[in-house]
């Protein structure tokens, strides 16, 4: 089991070369690790122990009843959840049925939880896979081990010149590259919101408000409350088994089934609800931040200055005014990866070139906007 988790850690290991934001890494690293770990835990408990154990009569073999109820799903009675346990009912939702089909709440998700968690992990990694493909190793190629900063002066000078030449010759050609990353962040937001609705469908419309109901349950008077965790993840359910009797007539057998995995499922999904809400909030803030960056050159100057204090303000203003948003984004990522002193020199040299060469001015309306 430990070897599996080590392999899982390597799968979602964050590279030392930073090509994305912290919030984006929460999606493809931490969240994928959490979902895969939960999937492995449920899979282990499901296929090593007994995922379902039904109380049966001697007429029905134990393995037959357990297998049937596992495949066909079990149910509880909605009208019995507010009955007092140990007095009116033996357990919430368990008791005699009045024959109303609408009163039955079926639990069809039980055997699919491990697969669903695995599928969710794949969906969370997809934006990362897409950005990795689009990024193409550009940042890793451009930093040329300048993140270490320990090399001879001649080698350092040569690498700085190569980096500066690339930035100069490719200025104004990085917008689509940056927009592709922003699209991946947007996909991450769509994914986490979509997964909330996916889980809501998975649990028959009970997941969207699950966390709110848990909070409300904790604050409600004990006499008037219904545990939403027991309602969605019951430990004990009913199962109806039909078979032919000795006279050839169909016999109906009611069984009580224990669902031990729901003890774990309950904790997993209450955690995931709050985690997904947090991810949604952080990702939404990140996208608002991206929109501000796209439309506000002054904000780009401010953010660059706040992050890289060794770089002179006039150099930053020249670069932002004479380049496009994609160039700013590339420089920002390079600054995250390169030695601070080397990065300061590269930015200053680029600003000097731009100051002495007017032909690199951004033409048209874009240039007027970026001159603001």
UniProtKB/Swiss-Prot annotation:
GO terms for biological process: cell communication by electrical coupling; gap junction assembly; intercellular transport; jump response; monoatomic ion transmembrane transport; phototransduction; regulation of membrane depolarization; response to light stimulus. Disulfide bonds: none annotated. Disruption phenotype: Flies fail to jump in response to a light-off stimulus. Neural-specific mutants exhibit modified giant fiber system and gustatory response. Keywords: Behavior, Cell junction, Cell membrane, Gap junction, Ion channel, Ion transport, Membrane, Transmembrane, Transmembrane helix, Transport. It is a multi-pass membrane protein. Monomer (isoform Lethal). This is Innexin shaking-B.
């Amino acid at each position: 089991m430990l070897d599996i988790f080590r392999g899982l850690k390597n799968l979602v290991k964050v590279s030392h070369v930073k090509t994305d934001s912290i919030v984006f890494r929460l999606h493809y690293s931490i969240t994928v690790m959490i979902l895969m770990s939960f999937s492995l835990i449920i899979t282990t408990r499901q296929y090593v122990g007994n995922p379902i154990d039904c109380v049966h009569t001697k007429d029905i073999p134990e393995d037959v009843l357990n297998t049937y109820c596992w495949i066909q799903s079990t149910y509880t009675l909605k009208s019995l959840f507010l009955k007092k346990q140990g007095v009116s009912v033996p357990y919430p939702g368990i008791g005699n049925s009045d024959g109303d089909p609408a009163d039955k709440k079926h639990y069809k998700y039980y055997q699919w939880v491990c697969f669903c968690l695995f599928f969710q992990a794949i969906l969370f990694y997809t934006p990362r896979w897409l950005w990795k493909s689009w990024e193409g190793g550009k940042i890793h190629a451009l930093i040329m081990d300048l993140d270490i900063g320990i090399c001879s002066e001649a080698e350092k000078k040569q690498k700085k010149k190569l980096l500066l030449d690339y930035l100069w010759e490719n200025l104004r050609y990085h917008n689509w590259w940056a927009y592709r990353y922003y699209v991946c962040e947007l996909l991450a937001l769509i994914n986490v919101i979509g997964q909330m609705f996916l889980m809501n469908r998975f649990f028959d419309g009970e997941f969207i408000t699950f966390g709110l109901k848990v909070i409300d349950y904790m604050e409600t008077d004990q006499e008037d409350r219904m545990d939403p965790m027991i309602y969605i993840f019951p430990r004990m359910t009913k199962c109806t088994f039909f078979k032919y009797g000795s006279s050839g007539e169909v016999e109906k057998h009611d069984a009580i089934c224990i669902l031990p995995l729901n003890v774990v499922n309950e904790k997993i999904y209450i955690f995931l609800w709050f985690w997904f809400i947090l991810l949604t909030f952080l990702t939404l803030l990140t996208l608002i931040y991206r929109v501000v960056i796209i439309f506000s050159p002054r904000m780009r100057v401010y953010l660059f200055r706040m992050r890289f204090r060794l770089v002179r303000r006039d150099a930053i203003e020249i670069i932002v005014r004479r380049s496009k948003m994609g160039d700013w984004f590339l420089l920002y990522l390079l600054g995250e990866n390169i030695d601070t002193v080397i990065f300061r020199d590269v930015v200053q040299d680029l600003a000097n070139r731009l100051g002495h060469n007017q032909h690199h001015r951004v033409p048209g309306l874009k240039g007027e906007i970026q001159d603001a």
